[in-house]
């Protein structure tokens, strides 16, 4: 197919990469790739370096994050493109460094992106036990490892961001075989899948974006899990009962808005694991959680981000 697709390239900071993918949730995006120099540097230095990095070094990845999103060349594109530009411009309102903040678009052949982006995704250890593996990659699992199969073709959180790692490590610590887990803003389903693979009794992932819901359902199927439900809608409207653990990897402002409602969905003595919180906003979120009746159990930090574990 000739020139049927449009590639939108967003040059931003590593810090804002997760938020930019969130912006893309609200558009008709068909594929996303994320090239983040920080991820590459961290993995090169990690003791859990899972593969040969020469291949990535040859890619000449720029400083910061380069996010490429792919759209059909149709009448809706100009609307989406303007929305993306405006949203990236306003990232600083959420306390995020947008970096260069440059947004450009060009037409590409389908084959230019359909497979090339896959070279940026490799098996990555994101917790003490959990490894996330793209479906097309081979990986020899170690005895104590739990492998999540993920197709990041829609790239709703691939596990490499600090906030995802923080949430996964918290789930590793708190999930047990009796746990019911609710995952707010499930995206790719990665946190729901992690909880299920950690032997949670039952997991419910919810998202307000139908594209994310479809992506999460596909990833659940890839992992052959029967203890997960993925639902479209608002937690308060689509979920019955209470959870031992509610996890949310979203922006600090959204956590503050949701905190009071989340309290109603956590059993007494249960936990609210929240991340997507830049360190500058930590105290704001803690204050709101305490106002809603949570006790702060623990705060974990990775880079410029934190994860707050609060007890109901």
From Swiss-Prot:
Subcellular location: Cytoplasm
InterPro entries referenced in this protein's UniProt entry, alphabetically: Ribosomal_L11_MeTrfase_PrmA (IPR050078), Ribosomal_PrmA_MeTrfase (IPR004498), SAM-dependent_MTases_sf (IPR029063)
Catalytic reactions of this protein: L-lysyl-[protein] + 3 S-adenosyl-L-methionine = N(6),N(6),N(6)-trimethyl-L-lysyl-[protein] + 3 S-adenosyl-L-homocysteine + 3 H(+)
A single GO BP: methylation
Record-listed E.C. numbers: 2.1.1.-
Chain ranges passing through the membrane: none
Gene Ontology molecular-function annotations: protein-lysine N-methyltransferase activity
Keyword Cytoplasm attributed: yes
Keyword Transferase listed: yes
GO-annotated cellular components: cytoplasm
Keywords: Cytoplasm, Methyltransferase, S-adenosyl-L-methionine, Transferase
Residues annotated to bind S-adenosyl-L-methionine: 164, 185, 207, 249
Top-rank lineage group of the source organism: Bacteria
Family the UniProt entry places it in: Belongs to the methyltransferase superfamily. PrmA family.
NCBIfam families the UniProt entry points to: prmA
Function of the protein: Methylates ribosomal protein L11.
Protein name: Ribosomal protein L11 methyltransferase
Lineage: Bacteria, Bacillati, Bacillota, Clostridia, Eubacteriales
Gene, per the UniProt record: prmA
């Amino acid at each position: 197919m000739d020139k049927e697709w449009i590639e939108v390239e967003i040059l931003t900071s590593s810090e804002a990469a997760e938020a930019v993918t969130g912006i893309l949730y609200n558009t008709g995006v068909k594929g996303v790739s994320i090239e983040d120099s920080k991820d590459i540097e961290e993995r090169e230095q990690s003791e859990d370096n899972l593969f040969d990095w020469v291949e990535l070094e040859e890619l000449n990845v720029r400083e910061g994050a380069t996010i490429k999103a792919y759209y059909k060349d149709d009448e809706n594109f100009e609307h989406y493109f303007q929305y993306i530009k405006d949203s990236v411009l306003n990232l600083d309102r959420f306390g995020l460094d947008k970096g260069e903040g440059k947004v450009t678009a060009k037409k590409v052949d389908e084959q230019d992106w359909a497979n090339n982006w896959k070279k940026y995704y490799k098996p990555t250890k994101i917790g003490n036990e959990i490894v996330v593996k793209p479906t097309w990659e081979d990986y020899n699992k170690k005895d104590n490892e739990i492998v999540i199969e993920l197709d990041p073709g829609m790239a709703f959180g691939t596990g490499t961001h600090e906030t995802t790692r923080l949430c996964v490590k918290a789930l590793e610590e708190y999930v047990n075989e009796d746990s019911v887990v609710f995952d707010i803003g499930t995206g790719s389903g990665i946190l729901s899948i992690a909880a299920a693979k950690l032997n949670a009794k039952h997991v419910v992932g919810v998202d307000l974006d139908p594209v994310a819901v479809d992506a999460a359902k596909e990833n659940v199927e890839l992992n052959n899990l029967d203890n997960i439900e993925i639902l479209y809608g608002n937690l308060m409207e689509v979920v019955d009962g209470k959870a031992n653990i509610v996890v949310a990897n979203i922006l600090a402002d959204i956590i503050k808005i949701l905190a009071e409602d989340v309290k109603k969905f956590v059993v007494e003595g249960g936990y609210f694991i929240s991340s997507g919180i830049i360190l500058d906003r930590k105290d704001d979120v803690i204050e709101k959680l305490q106002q809603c009746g949570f006790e702060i159990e623990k705060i974990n930090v990775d880079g410029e981000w934190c994860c707050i574990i609060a007890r109901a």
